Structure formats: structure tokens, C-alpha cells
């Protein structure tokens, strides 16, 4: 029994989000939420909301016991990149890439 939640086009770079995702991969769901709650990184707040959504999906759609769930899969993929322009000296310009992420969390019963 698995439940999935996806956050698309989150305004954080995949590199920064993967640092937090690696910490909670494979943990029991409640422990993962608790760990993310006390992290001060921006990615932790976003990933916590996705994990809580996946837990709610498992509970409401499949009647799973919350205490039995663990984070089976957590993926952070690259989303669309916003291209911005920053003026520089002597009439030049530089591109600024504002990266986005797609965060996918799958929770399931611990085996």
C-alpha cells in the first residue's frame, strides 16, 4: 500500500532541496515530519508539507495506519527555470537563473 504526493514548481533549487530530502529518505513518516519541523532550511518546510500530504492521502484514501508508514521514496527533480536579467556595467547584462523543483514523496507501510 503506497500513497503519493507531489509538489510541482517549488521555488527552490533542486540542489538545496536534495540536501534535506536525503535526511528523511527511509525514515518512519512521523519521525521524518518531526525532523523537518525543527530544521531551519526553507526546503524543510516545503518537504514537510509534501510528506504530511502523502500521509493524509494514505490515511484518507487507503485507510492506512499512520504509525506503520515510512517514507519509501523521495525525489527532487528539476522544474522549469525562470530566466531573469540583471543589468551590469557598460550596458551589458547577465542572465540570472531562478531554479524550481518538483518534489515527489511516496509513503508506504514498513515491511
UniProtKB/Swiss-Prot annotation:
PROSITE patterns tied to this protein: RIBOSOMAL_L22 (PS00464)
Domain of life of the source: Bacteria
MF (Gene Ontology): rRNA binding; structural constituent of ribosome
A single cellular component GO annotation: cytosolic large ribosomal subunit
UniProt KW DNA-binding keyword: no
Gene3D superfamilies per record: Ribosomal protein L22/L17
GO BP, sorted A to Z: translation
One Pfam family this sequence matches: Ribosomal_L22
Keyword rRNA-binding: yes
Record key words, sorted: Ribonucleoprotein, Ribosomal protein, RNA-binding, rRNA-binding
The protein's role, per its UniProt record: This protein binds specifically to 23S rRNA; its binding is stimulated by other ribosomal proteins, e.g. L4, L17, and L20. It is important during the early stages of 50S assembly. It makes multiple contacts with different domains of the 23S rRNA in the assembled 50S subunit and ribosome.
Sequence similarity: Belongs to the universal ribosomal protein uL22 family.
PANTHER family for this protein: CHLOROPLAST 50S RIBOSOMAL PROTEIN L22-RELATED (PTHR13501), LARGE RIBOSOMAL SUBUNIT PROTEIN UL22M (PTHR13501:SF8)
Quaternary data: Part of the 50S ribosomal subunit.
Protein known as: Large ribosomal subunit protein uL22
Amino acid at each position: 500500500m503506497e500513497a503519493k504526493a507531489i509538489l510541482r514548481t517549488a521555488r527552490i533549487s533542486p540542489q538545496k532541496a536534495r540536501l534535506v530530502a536525503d535526511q528523511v529518505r527511509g525514515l518512519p513518516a512521523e519521525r521524518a515530519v518531526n525532523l523537518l519541523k525543527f530544521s531551519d532550511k526553507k526546503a524543510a518546510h516545503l518537504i514537510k508539507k509534501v510528506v504530511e500530504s502523502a500521509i493524509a492521502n494514505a490515511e484518507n484514501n487507503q485507510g492506512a495506519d499512520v504509525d506503520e508508514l515510512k517514507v519509501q521514496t523521495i525525489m527532487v527533480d528539476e522544474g522549469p527555470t525562470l530566466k531573469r536579467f540583471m543589468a551590469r556595467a557598460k550596458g551589458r547584462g547577465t542572465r540570472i537563473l531562478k531554479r524550481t523543483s518538483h518534489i515527489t514523496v511516496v509513503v508506504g507501510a514498513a515491511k
